[in-house]
Regions:
Chain B
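Hydrophobic core residues within well-ordered beta-strands of beta-rich domains
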Residues: 1, 58-60, 90-92
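A structural signal for short, well-ordered beta-strand segments
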Residues: 1-3, 64, 94, 107
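Hydrophobic ligand-binding cavity/cleft-lining segments
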Residues: 1-32, 151
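A short, structured loop/turn motif at beta-sheet edges
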Residues: 9-10, 40-41, 65-72, 95-104
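Hydrophobic pocket/interface hotspot
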Residues: 12, 22, 46-48, 64, ...
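Glycine-rich portal/gate segments that line the openings of hydrophobic small-molecule binding cavities
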Residues: 34-76
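Beta-strand/loop substructures that line and gate deep hydrophobic ligand-binding cavities in soluble
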Residues: 74-127
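A conserved amphipathic terminal alpha-helix motif
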Residues: 111-151
Length: 117, 151
């Protein structure tokens, strides 16, 4: 995933209202009105959030004039989740090694460089 | 991510900030440290190379933002990519809390530094893996495009 795309995705997700909108869309399409309902903010404010999500490719909007249903686009989210998972594994394994290293040092076994004898 | 290590805080902090010690554990299973150059102080930079089991070298580099022994370490990191440029820059914050003879280490990593600066979030915006991953898991657990990843 390109750094820019990742940036855009995370920036879009950095707002709790937008995260809640995405969570709602996970259960199916909705209109702007339906999405605005749970929040104490104006329709134009919700529309602004939807624009950010749309630009990030996280939602797509239908074209019918009156009714422009919003739906979730899972691609960028999936990529973000994979990125997170990749790093979680990376650090998890590093910390396993750190744990092992700390044990060795305290038993007086390891050298500082961790070289095998 | 949080881990509890059976070691005193000073040692755990040293494991992160003494270059020879870092070389002993940094990186996924099977990786070895090939080269490292670390200037561990606020504003200092580092470069670090690790080699995968199949012989591919990965360089990373960054800047230390805070080095507060033995409780807090903050640094950026980015992978050096093909043409010598840098990939996504990330900010890592590690804190160390003593729990008796043990140490509770809390680790946060986020790609949000650039975003935080741009959007002017005063204190910066970092995210723990767990909070974000939890959000994804709970929000989308019923969605066909699940974000679960098999171990």
């Amino acid at each position: 995933m390109s750094p820019d795309r990742l940036d855009t995705t995370f920036a879009a997700l950095a707002d709790p209202t937008r995260r809640a909108i995405l969570a709602r869309l996970a259960s199916g399409e909705a209109s702007v009105g339906e999405l605005a309902e749970p929040f104490d903010i104006s329709l134009p404010a919700v529309s602004k959030h939807l624009k950010v999500l749309e630009r990030a490719g996280l939602i797509a909007r239908g074209r019918t004039a009156q009714w422009r249903p919003c739906r979730l686009e899972a691609g960028p989210l999936q990529e973000a989740a994979e990125w997170i998972e990749h790093y979680r594994r990376f650090w998890d394994e590093s910390f396993d090694r750190l744990d092992h290293y700390l044990g060795q040092v305290q038993q007086g076994k390891g050298t500082r460089r961790g070289r095998k004898k | 991510m949080t881990r509890v290590f059976d070691a005193p805080r000073e040692l755990v902090f040293a494991a992160w900030t003494d270059p020879d010690r870092v070389a002993a554990w940094w990186g996924p299973k099977g990786f070895t440290t090939v080269s490292y150059d670390m200037d561990i102080r606020a504003g200092g930079t580092y470069r670090f190379c690790m080699r995968s089991p199949d012989g591919v070298d990965y360089w990373k580099q960054g800047v230390y933002r805070e080095v507060l022994a033995p409780e807090r370490l903050v640094f950026t990191f980015a992978w050096v990519i093909a043409d010598g440029g840098l990939g996504q820059e990330m900010l890592v914050t590690v804190t160390f809390a003593a729990e008796g003879d043990k140490t509770r280490m809390t680790f946060r990593q986020g790609p949000f530094e650039a975003i935080a600066k741009r959007d002017d979030h005063g204190r910066g915006w970092t995210s723990t893996f767990e909070r974000f991953a939890e959000y994804l898991a709970t929000a989308f657990s019923d969605h066909p495009h699940t974000t679960e990843v098999d171990p």
